[in-house]
Design a protein with these regions (language model features):
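Catalytic core of pol beta-like nucleotidyltransferases
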Residues: 1-19, 25-31, 42-99
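Short beta-strand->loop micro-motif that forms the acidic, two-metal-ion catalytic signature
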Residues: 35-40
Length: 99
């Protein structure tokens, strides 16, 4: 978890946030569980450079440590549009703030 936090602090731009959600956040992960990371950026639209500079470092870390890390990324406005979904409720309820 510490290395994931370090990558989050290095990769997430000012105004952005990263949250761990899923089994690791709930404390019920088992061997083979993946790490689910929600990345929220404070901008109007995502660009290819956002994926290269923000989410890709998490994937590289996963390769480095032999774990599957699955970052998903939205703008804050996009994420707000998910408020009515069970996914939003689950992430909001169970997530751990990384940055």
């Amino acid at each position: 978890m510490q290395r994931i936090r370090e990558v989050a602090h290095r990769s997430i731009p000012k105004g952005g946030h990263a949250h761990l959600y899923g089994s690791y956040a709930r404390g019920d992960a088992h061997q083979g569980s993946d790490w689910d990371i929600l990345i929220l950026l404070d901008k109007d639209n995502l660009e290819q450079t956002d994926f290269d500079q923000v989410s890709y470092p998490f994937i590289l870390l996963g390769c480095d440590i032999g774990e599957e890390i699955n970052p998903i990324m939205y703008t804050k406005k996009e994420w707000e549009s998910y408020k009515i979904t069970p996914f939003y409720e689950n992430v909001t309820r169970d997530s751990i703030n990384l940055v």
